[in-house]
Amino acid sequence: MPVSWSMLRNHAPTALAAARALAHRAAQWPARAACANLVPAPDDSHASLSWDPDMAALLGQPLDGGVRVGLRVAVHELVFTTESRCDALPLTGKPDAEVGSWLDGKLVAEGLKPASGTKLPYEVPSTMFARAGEEALRFPAIALWFAAAAEALGELRQSYRRYTPGPSPVRCWPHHFDIAILVALEEGRAESARSIGIGVSPGDNYYAQPYLYVSPYPKPDTADLPPLPPGARYDPRARILPRTLPAPSWAVLTRRAAR
């Protein structure tokens, strides 16, 4: 079902910070399951998630036996899927120990390694300021941002297929919780070959609202680049987002929402 882009206007973007932080933290469970059971990929894509529009969930990479662990963002619940069933655990009010025990039990029952003790190679986001019970009305808005981003990036990915090696799959990265594609513009080592990252973040420490970004590599000199349209800016401060394009007041979504 196509995303109703106009619904992105239902919540003020700056009101989503707490719901986003809770969803970000919850997305670490699929990442832990992947890190515990998959061979590490050089780009960490083994721990990435993808948006499944049918389940309305961010799903981790497939594990042995067709198992996938994911997060239904709109209802804030962990899902555990096999080829024959889908089990779910509502996360509201659940301590990490209880969630970890539930997930470990599911994994071990399928002959997989437990995930709760897996140490991630980055700091897990804090949710000390957020209460899941107070964010029930805003979780669907976070889910809608991911659904809209996945749809738009999927279309954009098709338009960049003329390049070689070309665009990556649309992936959500649990470290920063952004969803993006990477368009490789030439063959060669990742640390030297030209590429462009294009993605959407639901918000982070730099911008407390969802935003769009374009991240060319190698990093260009902003003095040599043309002016950007209203609502966009060059932002060399961000650690992984050398060029960030915020979308305040929904300006960037106006034409898309009118489709």
Where are these regions (language model features)?
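Surface-exposed beta-loop interaction hotspot
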Residues: 114-166
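N-terminal ordered "arm"
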Residues: 2-68
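Short loop/turn segments that flank or connect secondary-structure elements
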Residues: 104, 108-109, 115, 129, ...
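Conserved aromatic-histidine-acidic binding/catalytic patches
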Residues: 14, 87-95, 130, 134-144, ...
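Intrinsically disordered, low-complexity regulatory segments enriched in Ser/Thr/Pro
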Residues: 62-91, 202-245
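Long, hydrophobic/aromatic-enriched structural stretches that serve as scaffold segments
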Residues: 48-122
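Secondary-shell segments that build the walls of catalytic and ion/ligand-binding clefts
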Residues: 150-223
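TerminUS-proximal long segments
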Residues: 21, 235-259
